[in-house]
Design a protein with these regions (language model features):
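Catalytic loop of the DD-peptidase/beta-lactamase superfamily, centered on the K-T-G motif
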Residues: 2-95, 250, 292-450
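Hydrophobic (often cysteine-bearing) scaffold residues that line and stabilize catalytic clefts
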Residues: 61, 65, 114, 118, ...
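Residue-level signature of the cytosolic catalytic core of signaling kinases
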Residues: 61, 65, 110, 163, ...
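Short active-site loop at a secondary-structure junction
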Residues: 74-82, 103-169, 217-228, 311-314, ...
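Solvent-exposed serine/threonine-rich low-complexity stretches and specific carbohydrate-binding patches
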Residues: 98-99
């Protein structure tokens, strides 16, 4: 039989175990309450594209608003468009106008190609890598010490100025690339003909071809808008993440922001996603040579360019509500949690001068953040205003104005804001309305109000 000392030790061990177990239970309970409280502060967004409908933004106080938008589409012969309005990270309005496809009304849940607005998405991906310590904006991109240091690329470089190109240079269109002789991202057919290629060049082959060319200016000393520079950034993301560009962006940028329906667009109507719109050009637009040098003539928005091959320079498709949610996730406001650090937000939106692009944004002068995108079948505009409102418009039709249409869309935004900003419903459509039982109901404002 155990002695008295042994019995006392056993009793002490038992008491200690009970105390420890009680502490663990209390800690877990407190942690659970804390987690629940945090979830209450920042609710999880719903699948916006499967939830939002035009009827949710129908109100008699905005009848004149709808008329102005419809008149705008009629004037520019635009078949359909999506418009979303956000204020201080709250989605107030989301509506489709015109048609999404034959006999299909445009709804806010339809996704549309966004052209160069894709560059903003890519820039966010770069900033996510920066926040994780995987790169700095000063990192060199090419050469033996660069990120894209593959031997095949190093062997292709003839102009040593390539060794000076930094990640920031690419983000600001200061890499030294030139579109003289054609933009390589929109000259696939000519590139195939000039090089005797029978297959559409991969991004790796395009990169090798570009690196054989001389740069137009010393990197960082001037700027020239470059789609190729953002293809290079897409490849930087792939190299550092070890996965393909679309997958990395969806898993590490878009889904953390609550955006579940962003996709790299296809080239042809047969490749469109179930909730993607049809694209249109003007009725007098001449058929184009197919980008793959097949010898066929095609509608310019379906095969005239290698849209998929644009990757992070212009290939994304999304709805305007989800695009608004992404902007809310990178704007530094607390209402929707940001997916990048405050420092990265400031870096992206810092304004220098008219000859310096912002990071991903076209321009951020006086806190007016602007991002545009245009190619056959698409015109897109994001306009973020100093008062916290953000207006996003994407059409499924291109016009003879080309990139110039964005200027007229911005004028439409100004007119609508002047007349109807105060009449927009005060609500939060990014998140579902919370369900309360009778005991918890009160007259106080809920989190979805402001």
């Amino acid at each position: 039989m155990p002695g008295p000392v042994t019995s006392r030790k056993a009793l002490a061990y038992a008491v200690a175990a009970i105390v420890a177990l009680t502490a663990i239970i209390a800690w877990r309970s407190a942690s659970a309450k804390k987690a629940t409280a945090e979830q209450d502060v920042h609710p999880v967004p719903v699948n916006l594209n499967a939830t939002l409908t035009n009827e949710m933004s129908d109100t008699s106080s905005l009848d004149g608003f709808d008329k102005m938008v419809k008149n705008y589409l009629t004037y520019w012969a635009i078949n359909g468009a999506s418009l979303s309005v956000m204020r201080n990270d709250s989605l107030l309005f989301a509506k489709g106008y015109g048609i999404a496809d034959t006999d299909k009304e445009m709804q806010p849940g339809y996704i549309l190609r966004m052209a160069s607005v894709s560059k903003l998405v890519t820039a966010v991906g770069i900033m996510v890598l920066r926040d994780r310590g995987l790169l700095t904006l000063r990192d060199k991109v090419f050469g033996p010490d660069g990120i894209l240091c593959d031997s095949i690329y190093n062997a292709a470089i003839k102009d040593t100025l390539y060794y000076r190109i930094t990640v920031e240079d690419l983000l600001r269109h200061k890499g030294g690339f030139s579109k003289r002789g054609g933009d390589p991202m929109f000259s696939t057919r000519w590139i195939m003909m000039q090089n005797g290629w029978t297959e559409v060049p991969t991004q790796e082959r395009l990169m090798e071809l570009q690196l054989k060319r001389r740069l137009r200016f010393v990197p960082g000393t001037a700027q020239e808008y470059s789609n190729f520079g953002y293809l290079a950034l897409s490849m930087v993301i792939e190299k550092l993440s070890g996965t393909d560009y679309e997958t990395f962006m969806q898993e590490n940028v878009l889904r953390p922001a609550g955006c579940v329906d962003f996709h790299i667009a296809g080239n042809y109507y047969k490749h469109k996603l179930p909730n993607e719109t049809r694209y249109y050009v003007q009725h007098d637009d001449e058929p184009a040579d197919e980008f793959n040098n097949s010898g066929r003539k095609v509608t310019r928005c379906y095969g005239g360019n290698n849209v998929t091959g644009l990757s992070g320079a212009g290939a994304w498709a999304a709805s305007t509500p989800e695009l608004a949610l992404l902007v809310a996730s990178i704007d530094g406001k607390p209402e929707v949690p940001d997916i990048i650090t405050r420092e990265s937000v400031d870096l992206m939106t810092e304004y220098f001068d008219e000859s310096t692009y912002s990071l991903g944004w076209n321009d951020t002068k006086d806190s007016y953040w602007t991002r545009t995108g245009t190619f056959a079948g698409t015109s897109a505009l994001i306009k973020y205003f100093p008062d916290g409102e953000c207006w996003i418009f994407i059409s499924n039709t291109s016009t003879y104005k080309g990139p110039g249409l964005a200027h007229h869309t911005a004028e439409l935004f100004d007119k609508l804001r002047a007349k109807y900003s105060s009449k927009l419903p005060a609500r939060q459509m990014f998140y579902p309305e919370p369900q309360e039982d009778e005991e918890s109901q009160s007259d106080e404002k809920n989190w979805f109000e402001f």
